[in-house]
């Protein structure tokens, strides 16, 4: 894990960060979620075209390539891609990237500490909703954090074949998770609303976390549907059978969830189980399905 020098924020950077603390995150997020579900015909199509132009969204790779094909903004935002738009790495000993976006940070978990950004760390225990048993499985392991910008494909896929063991919904803040805020809001990913998914794999346990953010109106999984809303004030755990008819088995590259606006995906791997591709450093663009790591365990 490479440590970068911590720069003292400027006055305007401090103002920008302070605004995040007073910004009405939940009301604005609820309003955004409601607006994104409205069917306003030509108005909706105009908004989609404007958004796509502003953020340089590549609609040509989507199954529906015209703004007028979408009834709501959310339908556009979680648009499925054309078949083979994201080829899945076929090496049986390789993991694939779970999402389009950019690497926020990646590297080794130092005991139980993960690097959030320049000068900021957070712990496995706080990230995993104080589940000490789960946290112990990933001490001295590896992690990768992927930031999904507004222009990106917002469905999240599996890096490997896996069986679901547990899902935890964690209520929390809705800070923006862009790279600037990641550098200036302590414990950002351990404070924000999130959905923690623990899986069994051939190399041991693996966790994939969907982290919410401002205007991330909802997160969903393929096995449970929309997780939020409704939003609760308590941590909620769901346990799953790992065999039998009710077991949830997912294949490498298979869709596992989606964001309706936002956000960030964090993956955790146990000690001495994988070796990341050397180029996957902070700021590097990612494409779902490309090689993430080699299984070494």
Swiss-Prot record:
Chief place of localization: membrane
Cofactor: pyruvate
Annotated cofactor note: Binds 1 pyruvoyl group covalently per subunit.
Known pathway: Phospholipid metabolism; phosphatidylethanolamine biosynthesis; phosphatidylethanolamine from CDP-diacylglycerol: step 2/2
Lineage: superkingdom: Bacteria
Record flagged with keyword Lyase: yes
Compartments it resides in: Cell membrane
PTM comment text: Is synthesized initially as an inactive proenzyme. Formation of the active enzyme involves a self-maturation process in which the active site pyruvoyl group is generated from an internal serine residue via an autocatalytic post-translational modification. Two non-identical subunits are generated from the proenzyme in this reaction, and the pyruvate is formed at the N-terminus of the alpha chain, which is derived from the carboxyl end of the proenzyme.
GO biological process: phosphatidylethanolamine biosynthetic process
Signal peptide span: none
Residues with PTM Pyruvic acid (Ser): 263
Enzyme class: lyase
Topology term for the membrane: Peripheral membrane protein
Keywords on record: Cell membrane, Decarboxylase, Lipid biosynthesis, Lipid metabolism, Lyase, Membrane, Phospholipid biosynthesis, Phospholipid metabolism, Pyruvate, Zymogen
One Gene Ontology CC term in the entry: plasma membrane
Molecular-function GO terms, alphabetical: phosphatidylserine decarboxylase activity
Annotated active site: 100, 157, 263
E.C. numbers: 4.1.1.65
Reaction(s) catalysed by this chain's protein: a 1,2-diacyl-sn-glycero-3-phospho-L-serine + H(+) = a 1,2-diacyl-sn-glycero-3-phosphoethanolamine + CO2
Site (Cleavage (non-hydrolytic)): 262-263
Keyword tRNA processing included in the entry's annotation: no
Record's subunit section: Heterodimer of a large membrane-associated beta subunit and a small pyruvoyl-containing alpha subunit.
PANTHER family: PHOSPHATIDYLSERINE DECARBOXYLASE, PHOSPHATIDYLSERINE DECARBOXYLASE PROENZYME, MITOCHONDRIAL
Function text: Catalyzes the formation of phosphatidylethanolamine (PtdEtn) from phosphatidylserine (PtdSer).
Protein family membership: Belongs to the phosphatidylserine decarboxylase family. PSD-B subfamily. Prokaryotic type I sub-subfamily.
Name used for this protein in its record: Phosphatidylserine decarboxylase proenzyme
The organism of origin for this protein: Actinobacillus pleuropneumoniae serotype 5b (strain L20)
Gene label: psd
């Amino acid at each position: 894990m490479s440590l970068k020098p911590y720069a003292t924020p400027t006055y305007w950077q401090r103002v920008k960060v302070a605004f995040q603390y007073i910004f009405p995150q939940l009301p604005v997020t609820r309003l955004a979620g409601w607006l994104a579900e409205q069917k306003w015909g030509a108005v909706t199509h105009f908004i989609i075209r404007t958004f796509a132009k502003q953020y340089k969204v590549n609609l040509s790779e989507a199954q529906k390539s015209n703004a007028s094909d979408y009834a709501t903004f959310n339908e556009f935002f979680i648009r499925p891609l054309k078949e083979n738009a994201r080829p899945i790495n076929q090496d049986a000993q390789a993991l694939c990237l779970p999402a389009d976006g950019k690497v926020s940070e990646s590297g080794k978990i130092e005991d139980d500490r993960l690097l959030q950004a320049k000068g900021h760390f957070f712990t496995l225990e706080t990230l995993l909703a104080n589940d000490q048993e789960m946290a112990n499985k990933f001490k001295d392991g590896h992690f990768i954090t992927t930031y999904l910008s507004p222009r990106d494909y917002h469905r999240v896929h599996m890096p490997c074949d896996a069986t679901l063991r547990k899902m935890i919904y964690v209520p929390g803040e809705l800070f923006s998770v862009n790279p600037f805020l990641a550098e200036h809001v302590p414990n950002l990913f351990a404070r924000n609303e999130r959905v923690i998914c623990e899986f069994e794999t051939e190399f041991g346990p693996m966790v994939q976390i969907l982290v919410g953010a401002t205007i991330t109106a909802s997160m969903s999984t393929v096995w449970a549907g929309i997780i939020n809303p409704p939003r609760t004030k308590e941590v909620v755990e769901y346990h799953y059978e790992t065999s039998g008819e009710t077991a949830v088995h997912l294949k490498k590259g298979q869709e596992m969830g989606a964001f309706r606006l936002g956000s960030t995906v964090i993956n955790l791997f146990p000690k001495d189980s994988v070796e990341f591709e050397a180029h996957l450093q902070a700021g590097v663009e990612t494409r779902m399905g490309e090689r993430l790591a080699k299984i070494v365990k």
